[in-house]
Amino acid sequence: MASVADRFDCYQKSVQTPDHEVVFFEQAYRDAYDSTPMDLREDFCGTFAICCDWVASKSKRTAIGVDLCSETLQWGRDNNLAKLKKSQQKRVRLIEQDVRKRNRPHVDVLAAQNFSFWIFKTREEVIEYFKIARSNLKSKGVMVMDMMGGGECYEEGLVDKRKIVKGKKGFKYHWEQMSFNPITADASFAISFKFADGSKLKRAFEYHWRFWTIPEVREMLAEAGFSESHIYWENDDDDRDDDGYSSWERQEKAPSDASWICYIVAVK
């Protein structure tokens, strides 16, 4: 099964919940400005599933997807964009370029999801990116990023396994923590997919990042000119929404869980 599997399809089914992201972006913008966001920019957009869900959620919403990988963008055109109505497709703009470039029109929400900005390994690189991201926002705009952490995230060789699809056509998702250097905070991770027949797409995706922390990122956002930043921490399982997704609230204190994910929202 691995020989005919589509790694991008497996990734989307395992990692992405674009409808949930749209709801959270609305919450983050509403908390900052008490109004509804209409225009989105998705940096490191990959297959730009979030862009597609964004324009489908309201009739006048627009989305810009920015990514360097032509293969990934084309997969998104064939498999995500093609599923939209023609009128919705017209409201998605794709730009194949480095995210560290300024573009118009400016947007209400700029998202850099799945820890993607961790590819920048120095403060100078991150601050430069944050400054450019800020300039791509309207006067009332927010930047949304997710973060992970906790002691387990530094354990080399740890593999988190989850069953994504059950049955004969099912598969499992493996998140592997390949290496971590405590001196430089360089970290490597990989995603593999294991199928019902025992075959495997080993390390279908690899990531070589700097493991940034929340305080570091908030300090760099301030240096880049953002007026404030907020941490959205996941509520208890009892507080999940009607679709079973986690709910999030602003917090300034959180438990030291073995592993956690949160959002950072920077307000222009």
Residues covered by each model-derived region:
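Conserved SAM-binding strand-loop segment of SAM-dependent methyltransferases
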Residues: 84-99
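A short acidic, Gly/Pro-enriched loop at the edge of an enzyme's catalytic core
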Residues: 100-110
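C-terminal lobe and adjacent flexible extensions of AdoMet/dcAdoMet transferase-like proteins
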Residues: 208-268
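Conserved SAM-binding loop
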Residues: 76-77
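Conserved SAM-binding loop of SAM-dependent methyltransferases across substrates and taxa
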Residues: 47-60
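Conserved class I S-adenosyl-L-methionine
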Residues: 36-46
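SAM-dependent methyltransferase
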Residues: 144-220
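A short glycine-rich, Lys/Arg-flanked "PGG" loop and its adjoining helix->strand segment in the class I
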Residues: 125-139
